[in-house]
Amino acid sequence: MPEQSNDYRVAVFGAGGVGKSSLVLRFVKGTFRESYIPTVEDTYRQVISCDKSICTLQITDTTGSHQFPAMQRLSISKGHAFILVYSITSRQSLEELKPIYEQICEIKGDVESIPIMLVGNKCDESPSREVQSSEAEALARTWKCAFMETSAKLNHNVKELFQELLNLEKRRTVSLQIDGKKSKQQKRKEKLKGKCVIM
Amino acid sequence: MARAPQPRRGAAAPGNALRALLRCNLPPGAQRVVVSAVLALLVLINLISDGSVVCAEALWDHVTMDDQELGFKAGDVIEVMDATNRAWWWGRAADCEGWFPASFVRLRVNQDEPADDEAPRARDGGAEAGGAEAQSSKDQMRTNVINEILSTERDYIKHLRDICEGYVRQCRKRADMFSEEQLRTIFGNIEDIYRCQKAFVKALEQRFNRERPHLSELGACFLEHQADFQIYSEYCNNHPNACVELSRLTKLSKYVYFFEACRLLQKMIDISLDGFLLTPVQKICKYPLQLAELLKYTHPQHRDFKDVEAALHAMKNVAQLINERKRRLENIDKIAQWQSAIEDWEGEDLLVRSSELIYSGELTRVTQPQAKSQQRMFFLFDHQLIYCKKDLLRRDVLYYKGRLDMDGLEVVDLEDGKDRDLHVSIKNAFRLHCGTTGDSHLLCTRKPEQKQRWLKAFAREREQVQLDQETGFSITELQRKQAMLNASKQQVTGKPKAKPPGLRGTPCRLKLFVPKAVGRPCYLMRQKHPALPSSRPQQQVLVLAEPRRKPSTFWHSISRLAPFRNTQESAALQKAQREDSQMHRSCPVRATAKLVTMDTSNSQLSGEVKGAQLLRVVILFSNV
């Protein structure tokens, strides 16, 4: 096999206003905007480690496409992993994930080997909670996918979400941390220190 | 400063080398070596020369007593000034400069944006609030939305330009690598899209009010250009083919390097070509969102209000139309496959006139002479109604029996009771009457609800035909042939590997059965496929289960749940995915090893290549 553009593609799905963009922005840029959240870029990227080497995590934002399933299918077919976001304050947003999940099944076939994460965002707004975590957990079990509650606003579980998602990937080792060769670098550090002194 | 980083150097030299490479015909081996070396150098120099904007975020605390080293806390932002060394970088945090381990930080992605884009925004807001206290927050929000529309549009234009100039143009120069047809498959009509969007963004800029952005009137722009956006339909429909072709080509390293060279030369962000090619699909879906947002913050008294409202509606329609065409096109493969599974097919292919299954079910057909009744499966497509007979033993096998042209037919609802012409008593019956030939077909359902459903379906068929005429939907001959070819290929390859999922628990009414081999479908006999084995054709038959939901949502779910589930389309997708996963399994480590061994076979260059290999790691880090 020749060298490939080694990217790992994650597609983020969910109804409008559940915080897909906020989650991605929080993860990639570390920021959160209370008042005005722009439609995010089409694709975000992040350097991650993959099989002890470096690769690009490509996060495809699907904002806007949930009303257009045929076009959504185009994003699904290229994804390696999927994040399905709903808001814990809206039952409707969870309902809207079902057709998306079915589409993923339809296109990807064997979903058990594909990392899928069901995410209940806005867990900081629990007073107006409409979806109990136990419910979502049960749904995740029937979908054979993982589940997590997050808050992009409080930066709760955001990094963990992406890390867990990558942990679900069994076909290769992907990780957010690029620390595969620490001991080597430790050695290198000594070497370099010497050099610096000389200069 | 303990040690100044490398002075800035232009990227011209390696850039030229790359340009030359794209033109000349080096032997692949040598080309590979040179390309990887040049690429690495190019990016590294770019990185250094753009040192001021490369920011990294600390992942861990770096505690150091060494005054040549830079200490920082996790989360600090460090400006990377020199990354020539793989493990130790030179950078600045706060007011200090020093060495730090590269592994302790991660490079910020999307470096092209200001590191903290909230600050200037807040300042803007503050200044304006000071100047005009009265300005409502709604105006500020409208300003934000308008700025966003403009900025995303500019970004998008840049993407399109990068693809057209960075990829398409370079590919055209290499007739030895790409045929015109291949380019058409990979890039579709992206150049037309680029042209249209250029005109569109120009119109937007003209209407943009720089001093008071919230007063800009953008609605009319969208309205004026709404028809142009329909070209996205062709692009979206072609996109799956593009992906298949790309994954086929990128199995050859020569193409991988070529595309990578194109990307670097154009200084594009670190996303593979198929990522870039998806942007138009994403973009056309986003207009309705942006316009909805704009409308939200447009006061009904605003001069732009009516236009924005109309624009939102128009752009929603455009996206819906594109979506619908995409869906229909996905269907034609299924229809082709369905047809090829019917025994004894006669006459022209279904796709010549039809492209959508509207309804299907079992009806009793009462024929004229002796008032004989026959059980037949009927399939209502746009323009025609096909009827088939079930095999006596194998109930899932269908024999083609005939078709009715819906265009000249009149549907007559009949009352229960004695039929005057045939002198039989009928129940739940309707008549299809052909005005020109005077032919008449009497059909009965078992239950009254079924009759109602059929009558509604006939009405829907007419609506569909009319709608297609209005929107100008048609299948090109090429698409039709491709679908028939795919269907026949499907017959050869047999059952797709993945079992049809989603049957469990889904509100699926049309279920698909995939029985074992039966006779060879007629379609294949007529086509010239001498190599086709007759032993493994595959039969697919639709069986209608009872609909549970109201009919209006019925078609929605049918399209979604794909009555003809085992399609070539999904097979192609699955194939592409398999290829994908294959290429990813062999990800960096092995690929790197291979590259090095390949390159070191050329002993002269091996030292340099290992260096290049080191630098490649930096490439991955530093593409900004």
UniProtKB/Swiss-Prot annotation, chain A:
Key words of the record: Cell membrane, GTP-binding, Hydrolase, Lipoprotein, Membrane, Methylation, Nucleotide-binding, Phosphoprotein, Prenylation, Ubl conjugation
Binding site for GTP: 14-21, 33-39, 61-65, 121-124, 152-153
Pfam families xrefs: Ras
Ranges spanned by the short sequence motif Effector region, renumbered to the chain: 36-44
PTM text: Ubiquitinated by the ECS(ASB11) complex via 'Lys-11'-linked ubiquitin chains, leading to its degradation by the proteasome.
EC number: 3.6.5.-
Name the record gives this protein: GTP-binding protein Di-Ras2
Organism expressing this protein natively: Homo sapiens
